């Protein structure tokens, strides 16, 4: 049986105020990070050197956005976290509702209204050696801060992409559906892309088809139809990817999930990426080839606007009320 967290943490109330703290002080105090039931300052937030998340990249994570005092698609992110954990035989020592409340509490503790959450579950402290059965308990870490993945001008002018030599791992190695802490292939692909002068890299699968970028899903517009690589191609079923697919349907546009070659990206009328941190960002150039006119196209701009309107008006309230399943 999983033991509950020690009762050392008083979750901030739904009003946004933490018992015993002055709200004016809260807004100026250093970043507070949630680790296993307690809040720590950035300088005090530490995990053991024997944590298997550090030693072996053994754990799972989610990146989550919040806008205008609402967490966007919180339940979907938490569900995916638990699915990833189940896939790697990792028991999260809390319920979905408790993890949701930990997330909301961390935002309240930092008195934030717009930002980014990094939710991490490590295998926990164990011994040297791969066996996860030496780890007694998983650790839950929540960081609520801000993020700016790309400069604002890139959302107006578009990114530069390049194909990476590092391939997306095969399904028979570790499913791309698992958001694990082992992101080394993505890191190496990012290094390759930036070394070539690009800002993001396109990762292919073992068969040479387009999978995704190092941290984002890919969409192509051709003759008014929107295309995206299939999940079977090695792309993550991104939360933002799913949202954009909904927005495409609402806009009355046709959407197709297909296998894509680099040729399909080279000859696209429009190309854009989606991700929690990136949101929806246009692409201007890929492998030294201009995409369309070299500027964000009308469908891309429409979807960016629809996405921004959606995230500002929907989501789980942070301060108005506590999470209700």
Give names to the regions the model predicted.
Residues 2-202, 206-209, 236, 246-325:
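Conserved alpha/beta cores of soluble small-molecule-handling proteins
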Residues 201-202, 209-232, 237:
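Glycine- and Gly-Pro-enriched alpha-helical subdomains that act as flexible
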């Amino acid at each position: 049986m999983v033991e509950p967290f020690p009762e050392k943490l008083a979750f901030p109330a739904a009003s946004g105020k933490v018992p015993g703290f002055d709200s004016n002080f809260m807004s100026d105090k250093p970043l507070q990070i949630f680790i296993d039931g307690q809040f720590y300052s950035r300088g005090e937030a530490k995990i053991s050197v024997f944590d298997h998340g550090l030693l072996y990249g053994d754990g799972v994570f989610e990146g989550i956005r919040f806008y205008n005092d609402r967490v966007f698609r919180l339940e979907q992110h938490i569900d995916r976290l638990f699915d990833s954990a189940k896939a790697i035989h990792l028991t999260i020592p809390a319920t979905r509702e408790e993890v949701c409340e930990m997330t909301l509490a961390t935002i309240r503790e930092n008195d934030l209204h717009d930002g980014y959450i990094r939710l991490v579950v490590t295998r926990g402290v164990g011994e040297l050696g791969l066996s996860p059965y030496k780890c007694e308990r998983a650790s839950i870490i929540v960081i609520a801060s801000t993020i700016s993945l790309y400069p604002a001008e890139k959302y107006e002018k578009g990114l530069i992409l390049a194909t990476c030599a590092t391939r997306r791992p095969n399904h028979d190695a570790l499913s791309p559906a698992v958001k694990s802490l082992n992101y080394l292939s993505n890191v190496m692909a990012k290094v390759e892309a930036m070394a070539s002068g690009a800002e993001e890299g396109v990762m292919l699968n073992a068969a040479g088809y387009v999978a995704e970028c190092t941290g984002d899903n890919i969409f192509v517009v051709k003759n008014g139809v929107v295309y995206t690589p299939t999940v079977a191609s090695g792309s993550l079923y991104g939360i933002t990817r799913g949202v954009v697919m909904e927005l495409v349907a609402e806009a009355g546009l046709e959407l197709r999930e297909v296998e894509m070659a680099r040729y399909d990206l080279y000859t696209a009328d429009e190309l854009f990426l989606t991700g929690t941190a990136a949101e929806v960002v246009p692409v201007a150039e890929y492998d030294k080839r201009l995409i369309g006119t070299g500027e964000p196209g009308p469908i891309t701009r429409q979807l960016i606007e629809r996405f921004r309107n959606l995230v500002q008006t929907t989501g789980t309230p942070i301060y108005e009320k506590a999470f209700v399943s």
